[in-house]
């Protein structure tokens, strides 16, 4: 593709060099540069792409999009105000606007994104659709699974995956949309048919200045949709978003339990086998069952059903899809054993998510609840004491341990968590080493007790310093169970 075509729509300050040249690759990572690459220099949080211009030239880069003046001859330099923002436009142009050619469903919110996109994928597949998936656990391009390094990829990678999905015959993509991706322009040129909002609770406040800034980032998604928006109206953040978008020329549907909504759940029954409820929609009522317990399952499935309604998925298809769903890896996932105890692994890493999984556990636990949790390092510190208070309140015993400490000292993170603990009570314990914490929890469990290990879920690593070490909560739990 000609460089001149790729840069259409950019607000260019100046150009040095030739625009009528062939470009066969677009990159922001100098390690992926090949001959004929257009290299976009991004000023990131850790490094600055402008520092890698000479390296990119040595690897064959032909042209650059920059924010700074560059005194190098022999290549084309296009100066713009914001390279990160323009990267989304360049990527969309280079791959010929792939998201306009199939149905992209975007799901945003603090919790529930992975569950909703996964269940939607299952139902649409049952409906004989071919579906791509983009999210926290993995990317699926219609043919193969790809390791996911973030909830929502950078715009170049995102458009690349969209293009592959089209090539592989996908007619849908169910996609998690993070607040970071909305704030950092990753999805600026994505054509969303449908937007879904789950909930808003404190998270990522190391990146967003406050909860309102976080909410506003999420809200951006719903001004990008062309078919419909679906909002959790029970959530305070959802109420604000609904008020702000209800006047736009895109239908908005609501779902909830406590507030009158287009899609509501009544007569909710939850036990260890799953959850059932009476579904009330704009045109019919129906009894729904899904073999995953908890109120979070009720909300997630209401969002899914609303999406199916908008997309015209037949009722028997989505009912069967919900009935057959096995949930999501690392989301309230049971570790099978014959020891008479329940061991559950869950990704809950926010106060709201931890409270939800522990309350759900209380609904069916016949014995004691032993929880294992920590908080990630180099991330929002405000949630740490909240997590401590919640873990202690809803557990018979909570074991506070390490999560992904990153560059912080684990003991310092745990000290923050302990700020929320009532020291007068004796139902808490600190075990810094996560493997030892899991082992201790399982060894203490008696018949009918529940051990719930939270924070990492599907993750198969632990980040200590800047290094990822292999660590899998399920593997560790299985090893501990085998020694009982």
UniProtKB/Swiss-Prot annotation:
Keywords: ATP-binding, Cell cycle, Cell division, Cell shape, Cell wall biogenesis/degradation, Cytoplasm, Ligase, Magnesium, Nucleotide-binding, Peptidoglycan synthesis. Its cofactor is Mg(2+). NCBIfam families: murE, PRK00139.1-2, PRK00139.1-4. It is found in: Cytoplasm. It comes from the Bacteria. It is an enzyme of class 6 (ligase). Its main location: cytoplasm. The gene is murE. GO terms for biological process: cell division; cell wall organization; peptidoglycan biosynthetic process; regulation of cell shape. This is UDP-N-acetylmuramoyl-L-alanyl-D-glutamate--2,6-diaminopimelate ligase. Carboxylation is probably crucial for Mg(2+) binding and, consequently, for the gamma-phosphate positioning of ATP. PANTHER family: MUR LIGASE FAMILY MEMBER, UDP-N-ACETYLMURAMOYL-L-ALANYL-D-GLUTAMATE--2,6-DIAMINOPIMELATE LIGASE MURE HOMOLOG, CHLOROPLASTIC. UDP-N-acetyl-alpha-D-muramoyl-L-alanyl-D-glutamate binds at residues 30, 151-152, 178, 186. One of its GO terms (molecular function) is ATP binding. InterPro entries: Mur-like_cat_sf, Mur_ligase_C, Mur_ligase_C_dom_sf, Mur_ligase_cen, Mur_ligase_N, MurE/MurF_N, UDP-N-AcMur-Glu-dNH2Pim_ligase. ATP binds at residues 109-115. One of its GO terms (cellular component) is cytoplasm.
């Amino acid at each position: 593709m000609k460089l001149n075509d790729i840069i259409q729509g950019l607000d260019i300050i100046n150009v040095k060099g030739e625009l009528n040249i062939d470009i066969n690759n677009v990159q922001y990572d100098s390690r992926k540069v090949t001959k004929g690459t257009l290299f976009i220099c991004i000023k990131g949080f850790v490094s600055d792409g402008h520092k890698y211009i000479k390296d990119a030239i040595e690897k064959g880069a032909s042209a650059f999009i920059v924010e700074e003046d560059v005194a190098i001859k022999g290549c084309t330099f296009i100066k713009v105000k914001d390279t990160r923002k323009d990267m989304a436009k360049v990527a969309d142009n280079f791959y010929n606007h792939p998201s306009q050619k199939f149905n992209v469903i975007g799901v945003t919110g603090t919790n529930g994104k992975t569950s909703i996109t996964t269940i939607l994928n299952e139902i649409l597949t049952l409906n004989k659709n071919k579906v791509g998936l983009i999210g926290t656990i993995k990317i699926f391009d219609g043919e193969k699974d790809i390791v996911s390094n973030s909830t929502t990829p950078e715009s170049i990678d995102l458009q690349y995956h969209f293009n592959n999905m089209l090539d592989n015959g996908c007619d849908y993509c169910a996609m998690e949309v993070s607040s970071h991706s909305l704030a950092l322009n990753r999805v600026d040129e994505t054509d969303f048919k449908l937007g879904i909002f789950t909930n808003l609770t404190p998270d990522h406040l190391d990146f967003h200045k406050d909860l309102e800034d976080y909410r506003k980032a999420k809200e951006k998604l719903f001004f990008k949709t062309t078919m419909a928006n679906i909002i959790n109206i029970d959530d305070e953040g959802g109420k604000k978003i609904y008020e702000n978008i209800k006047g736009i020329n895109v239908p908005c549907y609501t779902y909830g339990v406590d507030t009158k909504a287009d899609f509501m759940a009544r007569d909710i029954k939850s036990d260890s086998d799953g959850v059932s409820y009476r579904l009330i929609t704009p045109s019919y009522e129906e009894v729904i069952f899904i073999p995953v317990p908890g109120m979070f399952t009720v909300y997630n499935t209401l969002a899914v059903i609303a999406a199916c309604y908008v997309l015209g998925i037949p009722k028997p298809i989505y009912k069967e899809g919900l009935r057959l769903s096995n949930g999501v890896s690392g989301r309230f996932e049971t570790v099978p054993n014959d020891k008479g105890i329940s061991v559950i692994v869950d990704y809950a890493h926010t106060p709201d998510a931890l409270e939800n999984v522990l309350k759900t556990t209380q609904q069916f636990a016949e014995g004691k609840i032993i929880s294992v949790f920590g908080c990630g390092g180099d991330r929002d510190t405000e949630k740490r004491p909240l997590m401590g208070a919640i873990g202690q309140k809803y557990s018979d015993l909570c074991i506070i341990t390490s999560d992904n400490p990153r560059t912080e000292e684990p003991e310092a993170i745990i000290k923050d968590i302990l700020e929320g603990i009532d020291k007068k009570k004796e139902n808490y314990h600190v075990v810094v080493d996560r493997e030892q914490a899991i082992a201790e929890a399982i060894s203490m469990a008696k018949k009918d007790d529940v051990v719930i290990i939270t924070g990492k879920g599907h993750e198969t690593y632990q980040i200590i310093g800047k290094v990822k070490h292999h660590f899998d909560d399920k593997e560790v739990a299985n090893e501990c169970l085998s020694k009982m």
